[in-house]
Every structure is written in C-alpha cells, then in structure tokens.
C-alpha cells in the first residue's frame, strides 16, 4: 500500500518512523517549510523532514495547499507531486497546514489523522496541553477519517492512556506519540488486508476545543487555586513554560508540590495574599494562592539560566517570606 505522509514536529516523526519500520511504501512526505530556530536563528528542517531525508524519501514543503490562496504555485506543485505519488491513503499527524477539499478527495481511501485525544474531547491544535491544564486524568489517541471540519471526522480506532499527576506535556506527548504510531500502523494493516474498519461518527456530547497555546498564557495568575496553577505548570512544560516575576526579574516555573496546609490554617503565620511568599528554604518556595491554598515551587529557572532545584536557585536569588511574585503590589 502506498502512503503519503504529512506531518511536521516530533510527534509526527515517531509515526513516520513506525510506518517505515512496518514496511509501508512512502513515495512522498509533506512537511512545513524550514524555520529559523535557536539563538542563532539558523534555518532548521522539521523533525519529519530530517527523518524523511535520512531514509531517502521525497519531500515537499509547500507554504500552502490552497490553489486559490497566497501561494498558488506551491499548491500546484504539491498537487502535481501528490498525483505522481499515486498513494491510496494519506496519513496526517500535526502537519500544521489546513487540507483543502481537493487534498481530502485525492487519495482513494482518503486522509487519516492521528489526533492526540479521545475525540470529541479536545478537538484542535493543543489537545495534550489542554488535557493537562484542565486536570483530566485520562486521554488517548484517535485515528480519524478526515473531513472538512476541525477534527470532526469519523473515528476508526482509538485507545486511552492515563494522565499521571506528575505528567507534563513533554512526558505525555512521548507516550501518545508512540501510541498513535502503533494505532496508525494497525489501521493501515487492516486496510491493506481488506479487513473491516468501522467508521464511527463522533458523538454530539462531550465536545471540547483545544485552542492553540498563546505565550501570554504562560504568566501565572496567583489568585487561582494551587491545584490549577500546578496544572498550568505541567501543561506549559516544555513550552512556553509557566512564568512569574519577582522585582522585575522573570522566573520560569518547572516543578512544584501542593502544600497540604491552607494559608489561614498555619499556626503563627499571618494571613498572606495570593502571590506572597510564605517561606523559602531548601524544600522549596511556598507561595500563597487563591482560595486559601499554597504551592511549593521546587524547580525554577532565571532568564538565560538552567533549571535548578529550589535549594540551588535560592543560592543565587534571595527570596524571603513576604516578598511578592507576579504583578507589583502597593
């Protein structure tokens, strides 16, 4: 079976490698154009392109697939390459470009998407991050027959995965990438064997949208309960990274523990307001949060520095009870 693959980041690279290992013919790989990255802003190929070139696969990098859009020449060249590939099916994983109807209609067996959630929950661009941010304890991967909607197509295969209390986007991403790679191989092998692969319409209930993560969301609002702040710290790891400030210095937050005692329940400790430091020692920096809760920061990072355990961080940045994190207070 000939398969065209469309994807860009590391999540997609895992699936591409798994398809290669399974012996599928891949006459063409689509990925986003190279982007400047790193401190030197050097042009860098996507993880999918790097994998494809390492295996001698043909790669196309259109800026758009819209024949009537801003880059019609790119779209026309991609269309010619897709027609020449004569693939029976296209596999899509975190590609990053909208597929117009002509692309969806081109392969005889359509386009299959590897989506990192149990649809219809968390349709959209950031399903892993939003699941952690929302405090979900369970997620998974869905193989979906793509249609013109935003992750609205019929479901072919799905499998769940627990979200651990310590999971970050980085750790959950890697588990779901491996799970998605296994599921897409299962789906394609069933197709190739002529086996029945029932397409189930997504239910109307339980729909949630995982909007793209904006950098502006990274700033912590200390008026939120500690549990919700912790979920954001894990959801925004590795990017964009949850952050706060202290006396004008930006600090990223990577590790935490929920303090069991409430702020007002600590004997001998005066009432503190959200964002005020309760204590700072080798065990962490305890910060007052909303609803009388407290969060102990255990791994922090100054701009341009490394991630440090609280004890090491405090040796280079003096934090004391009563100081404020976040917006300055009068």
From Swiss-Prot:
It holds the Pfam family Formyl_trans_C. It catalyses: L-methionyl-tRNA(fMet) + (6R)-10-formyltetrahydrofolate = N-formyl-L-methionyl-tRNA(fMet) + (6S)-5,6,7,8-tetrahydrofolate + H(+). GO terms for cellular component: cytosol. SUPFAM superfamilies: FMT C-terminal domain-like, Formyltransferase. Keywords: Protein biosynthesis, Transferase. (6S)-5,6,7,8-tetrahydrofolate binds at residues 117-120. Its EC number is 2.1.2.9. The keyword Transferase applies. InterPro entries: Fmt, Formyl_trans_C, Formyl_trans_C_sf, Formyl_transf_N, Formyl_transf_N_sf, Formyl_transferase-like_C_sf, GART_AS, Met-tRNA-FMT_C. One of its GO terms (molecular function) is methionyl-tRNA formyltransferase activity. Belongs to the Fmt family. Attaches a formyl group to the free amino group of methionyl-tRNA(fMet). The formyl group appears to play a dual role in the initiator identity of N-formylmethionyl-tRNA by promoting its recognition by IF2 and preventing the misappropriation of this tRNA by the elongation apparatus. PANTHER family: METHIONYL-TRNA FORMYLTRANSFERASE, METHIONYL-TRNA FORMYLTRANSFERASE, MITOCHONDRIAL. HAMAP family: Formyl_trans. This is Methionyl-tRNA formyltransferase. It comes from Verminephrobacter eiseniae (strain EF01-2).
């Amino acid at each position: 079976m000939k398969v065209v693959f469309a994807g860009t980041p590391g999540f997609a690279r895992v699936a591409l490698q798994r398809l290669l290992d399974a012996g599928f013919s891949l006459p063409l790989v689509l990925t986003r154009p190279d982007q400047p990255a790193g401190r030197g802003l050097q042009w860098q190929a996507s993880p999918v392109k790097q994998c494809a070139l390492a295996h001698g696969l043909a790669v196309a990098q259109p800026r758009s697939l819209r024949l009537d859009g801003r880059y019609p020449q790119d779209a026309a060249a991609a269309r010619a390459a897709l027609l020449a590939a004569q693939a029976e099916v296209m596999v899509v994983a975190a590609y990053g470009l909208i597929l117009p109807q002509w692309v969806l209609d081109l392969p005889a067996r359509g386009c299959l998407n590897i989506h990192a959630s149990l649809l219809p929950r968390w349709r959209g661009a950031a399903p892993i991050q939003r699941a952690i941010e929302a405090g979900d304890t369970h997620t998974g991967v869905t193989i979906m027959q793509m249609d013109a909607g935003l992750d609205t197509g019929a479901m072919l295969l799905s499998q769940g995965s627990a979200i651990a209390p310590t999971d970050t986007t980085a750790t959950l991403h890697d588990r779901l990438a491996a799970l998605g790679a296994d599921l897409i191989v299962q789906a394609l092998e069933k197709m190739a064997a002529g086996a029945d692969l029932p397409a189930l319409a997504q239910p109307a209930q339980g729909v949630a949208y995982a909007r793209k993560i904006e950098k502006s969301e990274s700033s912590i609002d200390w008026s939120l309960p500690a549990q919700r702040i912790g979920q954001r710290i894990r959801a925004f790891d590795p990017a964009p990274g949850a952050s706060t400030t202290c006396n004008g210095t930006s600090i990223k937050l990577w590790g935490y523990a929920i303090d069991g005692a409430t702020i007002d329940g600590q004997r001998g400790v005066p009432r503190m307001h959200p964002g005020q430091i309760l204590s700072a020692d080798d065990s962490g920096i305890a910060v007052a949060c909303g609803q009388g809760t407290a969060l102990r920061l255990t791994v922090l990072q100054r701009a341009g520095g490394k991630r440090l355990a609280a004890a090491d961080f405090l040796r280079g940045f003096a934090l004391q009870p009563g100081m404020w994190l976040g917006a300055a207070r009068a």
